[in-house]
Amino acid sequence: MKFEDLLATNKQVQFAHAATQHYKSVKTPDFLEKDPHHKKFHNADGLNQQGSSTPSTATDANAASTASTHTNTTTFKRHIVAVDDISKMNYEMIKNSPGNVITNANQDEIDISTLKTRLYKDNLYAMNDNFLQAVNDQIVTLNAAEQDQETEDPDLSDDEKIDILTKIQENLLEEYQKLSQKERKWFILKELLLDANVELDLFSNRGRKASHPIAFGAVAIPTNVNANSLAFNRTKRRKINKNGLLENIL
């Protein structure tokens, strides 16, 4: 179906076509109606056309008015919009999306990523500076406190100083004994574990019976054997300590 046939029969197409023709020939955009720059050139063109030629008949007058309208709507391709009394803007830059500037989506993502990176770095640097400043303040405070303590000379007698040093020495000796016992305990446990692994590897069955079974807790062991220092080869009798309790085998 041709467009002419459709235009002759369809009311909706007729309405759309009439509205389009009306918009192209008559309708002037609102921003051009309010623009004094457009009005100035519009009036100047009208005066020039009236001064240059005078229509002799009604047909010539209609043709002249039609040509004037066509000239006024198509001559100014760069529409200048007045922002204020001084600044003006070319509407061609924003006519595709009024109120917004057309941008590239990828460029927006790049700009947003750059902005996020810059803000992250700025915040990171600020946190680092604040932390260093706080540490510096604490060091200054501690140094000032130490200087105050050094300036204060406590009035203690020689006997009191000797008592304090004696208590410090006793505490250090007690701590040393505890650490020595703990070290000895872990050494024995390590030797115990190593010897047990060796004996299990040597006397494992592996499909046959061992001719000499393992005698855990045996007393008759040569003195030159390392097993003498191990707990499971010692006599099972446990000693009683000074408090009346059984002593740990370790």
Swiss-Prot record:
Major location category of this protein: nucleus
One cellular component (GO) term of this entry: nucleus
Phosphoserine PTM sites in chain numbering: S157, S211
Sequence segments annotated as region (Disordered): 29-70
Biased composition (Low complexity): 52-70
Binding partners and assembly: Component of the chromatin-remodeling INO80 complex, at least composed of ARP4, ARP5, ARP8, RVB1, RVB2, TAF14, NHP10, IES1, IES3, IES4, IES6, ACT1, IES2, IES5 and INO80.
Descriptive protein name: Ino eighty subunit 3
Organism for this UniProt entry: Saccharomyces cerevisiae (strain ATCC 204508 / S288c)
Lineage, opening ranks: Eukaryota, Fungi, Dikarya, Ascomycota, Saccharomycotina
Gene transcribed to yield this protein: IES3
